[in-house]
């Protein structure tokens, strides 16, 4: 027999076939092999190479077998050189490149160090989020809760940094979607044919962001209606809900209109309607930041906004006026008292109701966390009631809205339970706060009637967004609304919005306008510059 002390090379593979006629050939194993037959990586060695062995023991093969295989093996090695190189690149090199692919932090756009809390993030944001969820996170933004987060300015505002962490989706215990884990495998369950499979959104109440009704993805594993498997239950912690709601609050506005006092009916209503139109723009931007709101269909978003816009504006007015007894702070430069409402017929009654509600909120010592929860509840709860004719469509995905409403209610209950109140006082305070919402709805109905009367008088020009919201609400019967619409078709009611947008389709009585689901009130989501930092 002939002993080969060195591993064979590609060009010398013919020597394996032309070995002496001895019965055995000794081939020593060595880690130094041909590069295309031994690709770097952790995927093992090619199985088609007969002379490769991973063990350190010598390999003895018959020379007869060697003679039969050498020719075919030589041809295979020569012709498949390029294929083996591609295979090596596909297995080892590609994995190496994927492992070293550059990723950036979802919060500050710095280089990401790994997948932390559900998203790619850097070490700084990972440590910051960990400290925030484990300790106190009652951060306050010194500006308008809209600070820029980048590598250089991420430490300037802790409140906006934590808000950005929540906005990108960082959660405690987050895992990569393309990887398993004991938690995910444990939560996955099979929905039986007689159980949740009959309900397309049977597991929706456990989700933070409900899926869109109009464009559901059938391939998504988070929906239980598309297949038999239900995704893992994802819940948003109450602290995260409260933080997102507080970060979504719009900035303080200014009317920027100088009108001589005493006010007349025209000047008073011009000031109030102009201010309401500006607030509506910011209200739409606020609603888009409510957890889960943008996951709803466009129809449901418009429906909720048109049903609750005046209530949302009123509770904001009440909150701004809570520290000024006897005053209503419509803007930083527009503060009115009860006597100034006498110039408009019926306005003094609405002012009295507003001041009484402000006094009640002041007596209850309303907290900022409670205010943002009540405000979101007003928005989401408005879809459960119908104010007008049967022609108004109901919500497409009412179960998703109910799930969002449950999350907001849980956040309110969580805050009250951690506010230091006794066990007996906690449910009492919850009832006291929720009962005030009926008073706000009553004031909203009064205010809507008053706006319709102003529209019928045709003395004060109404802005397009305010007109669209007013006609979309349709508080009165269709006949009265149609009559009001005919009376307001004069040139004095056709103005431009504060944002410069053209009038959108209205759900009013005007037959020439047809509502389009892709346009309307949601196009006014870009706030104007009529704002100032909150002091």
Curated annotation (Swiss-Prot):
Main subcellular localisation: nucleus
Keywords: DNA-binding, Lipid-binding, Metal-binding, Nucleus, Receptor, Steroid-binding, Transcription, Transcription regulation, Zinc, Zinc-finger
Name the record gives this protein: Estrogen receptor
Region (Disordered): 1-21, 187-229, 478-535
Span of zinc fingers (NR C4-type): 105-125, 141-165
Compositionally skewed regions (Low complexity) per UniProt: 214-223, 492-502
GO cellular component: nucleus
Disulfide linkage: none
Entry superkingdom: Eukaryota
GO biological process entries: response to estradiol
DNA-binding region: 105-170
Bias type Basic and acidic residues, positions: 195-208
Annotated ranges, domain NR LBD: 237-473
Region listing for Modulating, in residue ranges: 1-104
Domain notes: Composed of three domains: a modulating N-terminal domain, a DNA-binding domain and a C-terminal ligand-binding domain.
Gene assigned in the entry: esr1
Subcellular localization: Nucleus
Pfam families for the chain: Hormone_recep, Oest_recep, zf-C4
Family: Belongs to the nuclear hormone receptor family. NR3 subfamily.
One annotated GO molecular function: sequence-specific DNA binding
Tissue specificity of this protein: Highest expression in brain and liver.
Polar residues bias (residue ranges): 12-21, 525-535
PANTHER family cross-referenced by the UniProt entry: KNIRPS-RELATED PROTEIN-RELATED
């Amino acid at each position: 027999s002939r002993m080969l002390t060195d591993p064979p090379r590609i060009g010398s593979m013919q020597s394996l076939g032309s070995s002496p006629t001895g019965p055995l050939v000794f081939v020593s194993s060595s880690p130094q092999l041909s590069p295309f037959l031994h690709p770097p990586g952790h995927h093992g060695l090619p199985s088609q190479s007969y002379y490769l062995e991973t063990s350190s023991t010598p390999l003895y093969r018959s020379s007869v077998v060697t003679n039969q295989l050498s020719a075919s093996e030589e041809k295979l090695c020569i012709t498949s050189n390029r294929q083996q190189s591609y295979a090596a690149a596909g297995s080892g090199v590609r994995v190496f490149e994927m492992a070293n692919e550059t990723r950036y932090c979802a919060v500050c756009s710095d280089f990401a160090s790994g997948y932390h809390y559900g998203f790619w993030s850097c070490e700084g944001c990972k440590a910051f989020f960990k400290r925030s969820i484990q300790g106190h996170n009652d951060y306050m933004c010194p500006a308008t809760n809209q600070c820029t987060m980048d590598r250089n300015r991420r430490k300037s505002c802790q409140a906006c940094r934590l808000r950005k962490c929540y906005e990108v989706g960082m959660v405690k215990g987050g895992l990569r979607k393309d990887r398993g884990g004991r938690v995910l495998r444990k939560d996955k369950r099979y929905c039986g044919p007689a159980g949740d499979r009959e309900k397309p959104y049977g597991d929706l109440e456990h989700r933070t962001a409900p899926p869109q009704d109009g464009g559901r993805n059938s391939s998504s594993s988070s929906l239980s209606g598309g297949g038999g498997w239900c995704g893992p239950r994802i819940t948003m912690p109450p602290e995260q809900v409260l933080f997102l709601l507080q970060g979504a609050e719009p900035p303080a506005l200014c009317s920027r209109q100088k009108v001589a006092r005493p006010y007349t009916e025209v000047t008073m209503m011009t000031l109030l309607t102009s201010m309401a139109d500006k607030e509506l723009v910011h209200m739409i931007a606020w609603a888009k930041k409510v957890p889960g709101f943008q996951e709803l269909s466009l129809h449901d978003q418009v429906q909720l906004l048109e049903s609750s816009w005046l209530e949302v504006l009123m509770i904001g007015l009440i909150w701004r006026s809570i520290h000024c007894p006897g005053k209503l702070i419509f803007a930083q430069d527009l503060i009115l008292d009860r006597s100034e409402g006498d110039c408009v017929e019926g306005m003094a009654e609405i002012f009295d109701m507003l001041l009484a509600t402000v006094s009640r909120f002041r007596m209850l010592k309303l907290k900022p966390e409670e205010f943002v929860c009540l405000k979101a509840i007003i928005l989401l709860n408005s879809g459960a009631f119908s104010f007008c004719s049967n022609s108004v469509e109901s919500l497409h995905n009412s179960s998703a809205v109910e799930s969002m409403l449950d999350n907001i209610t849980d956040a309110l209950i969580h805050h009250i339970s951690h506010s230091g109140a006794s066990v007996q006082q906690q449910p009492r305070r919850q009832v006291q706060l929720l009962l005030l919402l009926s008073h706000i709805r009553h004031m909203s109905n009064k205010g809507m009637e008053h706006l319709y009367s102003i529209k019928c008088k045709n003395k004060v020009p109404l802005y397009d967004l305010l007109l669209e919201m007013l006609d979309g609400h349709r508080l009165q019967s269709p006949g009265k609304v149609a009559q009001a619409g005919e009376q307001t078709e004069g040139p004095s009611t056709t103005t431009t919005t504060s944002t410069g947008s053209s009038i959108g389709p209205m759900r009013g009585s005007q037959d020439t306008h047809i509502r389009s689901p892709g346009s309307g009130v949601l196009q006014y989501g870009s706030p104007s510059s009529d704002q100032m930092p909150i002091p």
